Design a protein with these regions (language model features):
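Secondary-structure boundary elements
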Residues: 8-10, 108-114, 135
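A short catalytic or substrate-binding loop motif that flags glycine-/basic-rich loops and adjacent residues
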Residues: 57, 123-124
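Amphipathic interaction/junction segments at domain boundaries or subunit interfaces
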Residues: 1-90
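Short, hydrophobic/π-rich interface segment
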Residues: 65-122
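Short, intrinsically disordered/low-complexity patches at protein termini
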Residues: 37-40, 99-100, 131-132
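C-terminal edge-of-domain segments
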Residues: 124-134
Length: 135
Protein backbone atom coordinates (compact mmCIF):
# COMPACT_ATOMS: atom_id res chain seq x y z
CA UNK A 1 0.00 0.00 0.00
CA UNK A 2 2.83 2.41 0.87
CA UNK A 3 4.60 1.63 -2.40
CA UNK A 4 1.44 2.20 -4.43
CA UNK A 5 0.79 5.49 -2.60
CA UNK A 6 4.34 6.64 -3.37
CA UNK A 7 3.83 5.77 -7.04
CA UNK A 8 0.75 8.03 -7.14
CA UNK A 9 2.77 11.08 -6.08
CA UNK A 10 4.60 12.56 -9.08
CA UNK A 11 7.38 13.95 -6.89
CA UNK A 12 8.02 10.56 -5.22
CA UNK A 13 7.34 8.09 -8.04
CA UNK A 14 10.92 7.89 -9.28
CA UNK A 15 12.30 7.09 -5.81
CA UNK A 16 9.40 4.91 -4.56
CA UNK A 17 11.22 1.59 -4.89
CA UNK A 18 14.31 3.03 -3.23
CA UNK A 19 12.33 4.25 -0.24
CA UNK A 20 10.65 0.88 0.26
CA UNK A 21 13.95 -0.93 -0.30
CA UNK A 22 15.68 1.18 2.33
CA UNK A 23 12.87 0.48 4.81
CA UNK A 24 12.80 -3.27 4.08
CA UNK A 25 16.55 -3.77 4.34
CA UNK A 26 17.58 -1.24 6.98
CA UNK A 27 14.56 -1.55 9.27
CA UNK A 28 12.61 -4.78 8.77
CA UNK A 29 15.43 -7.15 7.81
CA UNK A 30 17.93 -5.56 10.20
CA UNK A 31 15.51 -6.01 13.11
CA UNK A 32 14.79 -9.63 12.13
CA UNK A 33 18.54 -10.25 11.96
CA UNK A 34 19.11 -8.64 15.37
CA UNK A 35 16.38 -10.75 16.98
CA UNK A 36 17.78 -13.92 15.41
CA UNK A 37 21.25 -13.05 16.73
CA UNK A 38 19.75 -12.77 20.22
CA UNK A 39 17.99 -16.12 19.83
CA UNK A 40 21.31 -17.75 18.92
CA UNK A 41 22.25 -17.47 22.61
CA UNK A 42 19.62 -20.10 23.47
CA UNK A 43 21.20 -23.54 24.00
CA UNK A 44 20.17 -25.88 21.18
CA UNK A 45 19.28 -22.93 18.95
CA UNK A 46 19.98 -24.71 15.65
CA UNK A 47 17.79 -27.69 16.55
CA UNK A 48 14.95 -25.47 17.75
CA UNK A 49 15.16 -23.04 14.83
CA UNK A 50 15.30 -25.75 12.17
CA UNK A 51 12.41 -27.64 13.76
CA UNK A 52 10.19 -24.54 13.94
CA UNK A 53 11.12 -23.33 10.44
CA UNK A 54 10.37 -26.72 8.89
CA UNK A 55 7.10 -27.11 10.81
CA UNK A 56 5.89 -23.71 9.59
CA UNK A 57 6.76 -24.62 6.02
CA UNK A 58 4.99 -28.00 6.30
CA UNK A 59 1.81 -26.74 7.94
CA UNK A 60 1.19 -23.27 6.48
CA UNK A 61 -0.94 -22.76 3.40
CA UNK A 62 0.97 -19.54 2.66
CA UNK A 63 3.73 -21.45 0.89
CA UNK A 64 4.00 -24.54 -1.23
CA UNK A 65 7.31 -26.19 -0.52
CA UNK A 66 9.36 -29.34 -0.22
CA UNK A 67 11.63 -29.84 2.76
CA UNK A 68 14.65 -32.03 3.41
CA UNK A 69 16.56 -32.16 6.64
CA UNK A 70 19.63 -33.83 8.03
CA UNK A 71 21.54 -33.62 11.26
CA UNK A 72 23.45 -30.47 10.32
CA UNK A 73 21.45 -28.92 7.48
CA UNK A 74 18.00 -28.42 6.06
CA UNK A 75 16.72 -27.37 2.66
CA UNK A 76 13.43 -25.80 1.70
CA UNK A 77 12.43 -25.50 -1.94
CA UNK A 78 9.55 -23.05 -2.25
CA UNK A 79 7.37 -23.37 -5.35
CA UNK A 80 4.67 -20.89 -4.27
CA UNK A 81 5.46 -17.99 -1.97
CA UNK A 82 3.20 -15.68 0.03
CA UNK A 83 5.24 -12.61 -0.91
CA UNK A 84 5.56 -13.51 -4.59
CA UNK A 85 1.81 -14.15 -4.85
CA UNK A 86 0.84 -11.00 -2.90
CA UNK A 87 3.12 -8.73 -4.92
CA UNK A 88 1.87 -10.15 -8.24
CA UNK A 89 -1.80 -9.97 -7.21
CA UNK A 90 -1.38 -6.35 -6.13
CA UNK A 91 0.25 -5.25 -9.36
CA UNK A 92 3.78 -4.73 -8.04
CA UNK A 93 5.73 -7.94 -8.79
CA UNK A 94 8.97 -5.96 -8.77
CA UNK A 95 8.64 -5.57 -4.98
CA UNK A 96 8.99 -9.30 -4.37
CA UNK A 97 12.75 -8.98 -4.89
CA UNK A 98 12.92 -6.84 -1.75
CA UNK A 99 11.59 -9.76 0.31
CA UNK A 100 14.27 -11.98 -1.25
CA UNK A 101 16.95 -9.39 -0.48
CA UNK A 102 15.64 -9.06 3.09
CA UNK A 103 16.28 -12.79 3.61
CA UNK A 104 19.95 -12.21 2.78
CA UNK A 105 20.17 -9.54 5.49
CA UNK A 106 18.12 -11.54 7.99
CA UNK A 107 20.12 -14.76 7.68
CA UNK A 108 23.50 -13.40 6.61
CA UNK A 109 26.31 -13.30 9.14
CA UNK A 110 24.71 -15.46 11.82
CA UNK A 111 27.09 -17.35 14.10
CA UNK A 112 25.24 -20.65 14.42
CA UNK A 113 23.35 -20.96 11.14
CA UNK A 114 24.65 -20.50 7.62
CA UNK A 115 22.35 -19.63 4.73
CA UNK A 116 22.61 -19.84 0.98
CA UNK A 117 20.23 -19.65 -1.93
CA UNK A 118 20.93 -19.75 -5.66
CA UNK A 119 17.54 -18.72 -7.02
CA UNK A 120 14.25 -17.10 -6.04
CA UNK A 121 10.77 -16.68 -7.45
CA UNK A 122 11.13 -12.93 -6.97
CA UNK A 123 14.07 -12.84 -9.36
CA UNK A 124 12.26 -14.92 -11.97
CA UNK A 125 13.34 -18.47 -11.13
CA UNK A 126 11.01 -21.47 -10.86
CA UNK A 127 11.52 -21.72 -7.08
CA UNK A 128 13.40 -20.41 -4.06
CA UNK A 129 16.05 -22.89 -2.94
CA UNK A 130 16.84 -22.17 0.70
CA UNK A 131 19.76 -24.06 2.24
CA UNK A 132 20.50 -23.68 5.96
CA UNK A 133 23.36 -25.39 7.75
CA UNK A 134 24.78 -25.63 11.23
CA UNK A 135 28.01 -23.67 11.69
Amino acid sequence: ALYKALLQDDSLREDARGYVQKYMLEKVAAEKHASTVKMEAVPGFYRIYSSVFLKIMRTSDLWESEQRSGKDCFDVTIKRCLWHTACAENGCPELCRLFCDADNVTYGGLRKIGFSRTKTLGYGADCCDFHFFRK
